[in-house]
Curated annotation (Swiss-Prot):
It comes from the Eukaryota. It comes from Homo sapiens (Human). One of its GO terms (molecular function) is peptide antigen binding. One of its GO terms (biological process) is adaptive immune response. V region of the variable domain of T cell receptor (TR) alpha chain that participates in the antigen recognition. Alpha-beta T cell receptors are antigen specific receptors which are essential to the immune response and are present on the cell surface of T lymphocytes. Recognize peptide-major histocompatibility (MH) (pMH) complexes that are displayed by antigen presenting cells (APC), a prerequisite for efficient T cell adaptive immunity against pathogens. Keywords: Adaptive immunity, Cell membrane, Disulfide bond, Glycoprotein, Immunity, Immunoglobulin domain, Membrane, Receptor, Signal, T cell receptor. This is T cell receptor alpha variable 12-1. Residues 23-112 form the Ig-like domain. Glycans are attached at residue 43. GO terms for cellular component: T cell receptor complex.
Amino acid sequence: MISLRVLLVILWLQLSWVWSQRKEVEQDPGPFNVPEGATVAFNCTYSNSASQSFFWYRQDCRKEPKLLMSVYSSGNEDGRFTAQLNRASQYISLLIRDSKLSDSATYLCVVN
């Protein structure tokens, strides 16, 4: 069984990493109230022009985030979900078309 000391060290390392990365990515604040059937856009800007990998995660209530979509070039589309990347403006967005109640979640932008 993992000791409390080990857990605290792991938590400290994770918090230190988050603190060091704090200005790298900015995401539009939420929450958004979107009527069913509408299109919603989540926007994210990043400051490191050397970034190569871009990801959108979906986190349902009280669950771990799950990878929704990865983007390595200008964009990616999967059904009702579209990710668009503009490297010149250091901007990435996630569009959800024909929104459904089941789309209710937290959406997270990750830049690597």
